[in-house]
């Protein structure tokens, strides 16, 4: 299976980034693997140039990754684009998973495996909780929705 799995993420001040990194580290450690994290060192609106450089650096390394977990589908697509510069392609040379299950990731020529956050269910639940509050229900609730892995063809079968 994959042994050198890298997490490539966004800006350093994001709560979402911190939670995704923590989940990645926990999963890696549970499987006896060393977490490898590469995140931007500053906040930026356009992650493209940073992501490109990080990707080129990782794949030029003596021990390049055999799999990448990207912070988002957009990050994953930027990684895929940069890998092409080196003649690399997923899933032939490495596996990649995004996060968000965006419409672009579903396109057949990208076919990005992605983690779905079930945005529709999240939105519906948020409206339901808001209506309950408006109706006088002041209980504090915590709802946890399980993400779903949407398997497409950006990961090698192992």
Model-derived segments and spans:
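Bacterial carbohydrate/catabolite-sensing allosteric modules
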Residues: 1-158
